[in-house]
Amino acid sequence: MNKNKIVLAYSGGLDTSVAIAWLKKDFDVIAVCMDVGEGKDLQFIHEKALKIGAIESYVIDVKEEFAEAFVLPALQAHAFYEQKYPLVSALSRPLISKKLVDIAHECGATYIAHGCTGKGNDQVRFEIAIAALDPTIEVIAPVRDWHWSREEEIAFAKENGVPIPADLDNPYSVDQNLWGRANECGVLENPWNQAPEEAYDMTVSPEEAPDRPEYIDITFEAGVPIALNGKVLSLANLIIELNQIAGAHGIGRIDHVENRLVGIKSREIYECPGAITLLAAHKEIEDLTFVREVSHFKPILENELSNLIYNGLWYNPATQAILSYLKETQKVVNGIAKVKLYKGHVQVVARQSDNSLYDENLATYTSADSFDQEAAIGFIKLWGLPTQVNAQVNKKGVV
């Protein structure tokens, strides 16, 4: 009897490995793993999926697409959820969903499965994205639906010949891509516990970072970082290199108690050395090149966009409309930011741009000053006129 095909988002971990063994009883399982920049060799995942029982197994390198189509808009939007979290995991989910749907179409599959639990954000992100891309596809979430304990999963794995991951005793749950690393669980679940050094991987402790600062130049063209210290790189490779450089100085550690979409609070440890450095540099070039009105209005949309992405609404029309506006603003974001990295701190210490709106002759207090100070008298009178009229009408007799 021919089975229906199901495309599984496969990580190689216990949950999705057990899912293959479970699903293959009723489906032909097609395992798909996306390389979004974990920095690991994922070939073993391809072989493991086939060994467990998948009929096909894909490992797809999507680092460049992830950087260009998802990370870049977030960088240009200065996207921080709750002003702290640069949306590390949230940014990869719409791309992973898109690839799952594409492969489902290619293989004639009408089902997609993921390994998310029922209390996280990712189940929402995957299922809403898949529904937006193809509402006819049915999504199955084995881990959420089983209600199995960890012990029951391990027992099932042993009974069915599923390899047990070597790091099963690791107390942490980690997700990593180009844009950073997210870590939760274990001792981190108590917000009073300081995160131990073992919870970090991409960054050195700021106390152990070099005693001398390092200066780097980041070049932007139409809002896109195109070169690091004068060396032109693809966006993905620039981020990878910057992760190494900034991570060595303890840059990008974030300890955040955040409000999850599903209604609970979660304590997360993030490491985003490249992201935090790029975000600081990009903001400074914007400050140099934007007119005041764009500088003041853009953050309103940035905050709304951050919430939309975090909440799994990348493919919502509101998200796409905001992204279109933000892309339009980037035409003038050209220049070089000189960044100082020192013991966990990022500081842009110099910047230049051919589109700079900073006029030194207008800003100076020296004899080279070209600002017409006499014009200020009339400006103040007109600017303050509504306030003056209000006082004359409504504050009579007020001391």
Curated annotation (Swiss-Prot):
This enzyme's EC code(s): 6.3.4.5
Catalysed transformations (reactions): L-citrulline + L-aspartate + ATP = 2-(N(omega)-L-arginino)succinate + AMP + diphosphate + H(+)
Metabolic or biological pathway: Amino-acid biosynthesis; L-arginine biosynthesis; L-arginine from L-ornithine and carbamoyl phosphate: step 2/3
GO terms, biological process: argininosuccinate metabolic process; L-arginine biosynthetic process; urea cycle
A GO term, aspect molecular function: ATP binding
Principal cellular location given in the protein's record: cytoplasm
Location in the cell: Cytoplasm
Enzyme class: ligase
PROSITE patterns for this protein: ARGININOSUCCIN_SYN_1, ARGININOSUCCIN_SYN_2
Residues where L-citrulline binds: 85, 121, 125, 173, 258, 270
GO CC annotation terms, alphabetical: cytoplasm
Annotated residues for binding of ATP: 9-17, 115
Keyword list, A-Z: Amino-acid biosynthesis, Arginine biosynthesis, ATP-binding, Cytoplasm, Ligase, Nucleotide-binding
HAMAP family registered for this protein in UniProt: Arg_succ_synth_type1
Similarity comment text for this entry: Belongs to the argininosuccinate synthase family. Type 1 subfamily.
Protein name (database record): Argininosuccinate synthase
Species this protein is from: Streptococcus uberis (strain ATCC BAA-854 / 0140J)
Taxonomic classification: Bacteria, Bacillati, Bacillota, Bacilli, Lactobacillales
